[in-house]
């Protein structure tokens, strides 16, 4: 299981002129004083580097969601959502990236795509050791869709479902929207995350959630991922009237209902 990785060189995305637009890290201390919600966990991913996480656990037999957030968010931003998942009897495990929240290091694309494997192995072992027996879904929002698709495409035997929210299909349009001159850099899609290619390999139940008027990652991307998905059991949920940043406010009930329906139908 430890060797399950896509052999993709992401170094072209690690140029400073790309990283400055792609990642927006902030520390947890910049957020606000936190009332303790959930279980704070540090996940080792390399020499002297740990990733911060917060595990919101509802029950030993409840379904589990390993969650990778967007590029401007941190785990602490999900302190209010974690208990809501718990009310639905779902274990919710959001994790950060290097340089985000309580995490060490500096974020790069190469590190992000490698770290998600170390994170997955840690979470899988932690759940087993702590006696959590429910199914495990991987979920990614926005930039986090890259980590979720990387894991689902390489470790399909070890996951039970895939959830993508506000995910991108192609890298070049996203980079261009972020202000990166992809033509000048000579960037081609084969240099990118290959999200569409990856989802064609994934046959586990798949849920795609996307805002109708997403101004950062257009709804077309969600539709493209859905169309390319190899899963027989798949659903595309559009959140009407919402954009990239108010998808929770406008569609939280439908959003959570779709996730609850999916994960609670998974075999235990």
Walk through the language-model features, giving the residues of each.
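An N-terminal hydrophobic leader/cap segment in hydrolases
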Residues: 1-44
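Conserved alpha/beta-hydrolase
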Residues: 85-104
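Alpha/beta-hydrolase active-site loop
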Residues: 107-129, 197
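Hydrolase active-site cap/lid region
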Residues: 147-198
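Short beta-strand/loop motif that positions the catalytic acidic residue
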Residues: 202-203, 208-210, 214
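Acidic catalytic loop of the alpha/beta-hydrolase fold
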Residues: 212-217, 244-246
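Catalytic histidine-centered segment of alpha/beta-hydrolase-like enzymes
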Residues: 242-253
């Amino acid at each position: 299981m430890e060797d399950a990785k896509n052999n993709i060189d992401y170094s072209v995305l690690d140029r400073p002129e790309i990283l400055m637009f792609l990642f927006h890290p902030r520390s947890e201390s910049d957020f606000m004083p936190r009332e303790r919600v959930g279980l704070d966990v540090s996940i080792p991913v390399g020499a002297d580097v740990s990733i911060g996480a917060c595990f919101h656990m509802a029950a030993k037999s409840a379904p589990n969601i390993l969650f990778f957030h967007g590029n401007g968010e941190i785990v602490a931003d999900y302190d209010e959502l974690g208990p809501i998942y718990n009310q639905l009897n779902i274990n919710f495990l959001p994790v950060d990236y290097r340089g985000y929240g309580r995490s060490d290091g500096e974020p790069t694309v190469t590190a992000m795509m490698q770290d998600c494997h170390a994170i997955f192995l840690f979470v899988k072992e932690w759940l087993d050791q702590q006696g959590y027996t429910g199914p495990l879904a991987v979920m990614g929002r926005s930039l986090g869709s890259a980590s979720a698709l990387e894991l689902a495409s390489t470790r399909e035997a070890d996951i039970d479902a895939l959830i993508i929210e506000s995910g991108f299909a192609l890298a070049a349009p996203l980079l261009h929207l972020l202000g990166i001159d992809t033509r000048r850099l000579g960037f081609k899609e084969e240099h990118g995350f290959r999200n569409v290619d990856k989802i064609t390999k994934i046959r586990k139940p798949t849920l795609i959630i996307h805002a109708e008027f997403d101004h950062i990652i257009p709804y077309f991307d969600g539709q493209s991922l859905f169309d390319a998905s190899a899963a027989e059991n798949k659903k595309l949920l559009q959140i009407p009237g919402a954009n990239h940043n108010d998808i929770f406010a406008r569609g939280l009930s439908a959003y959570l209902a779709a996730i609850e329906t999916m994960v609670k139908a998974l075999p235990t």
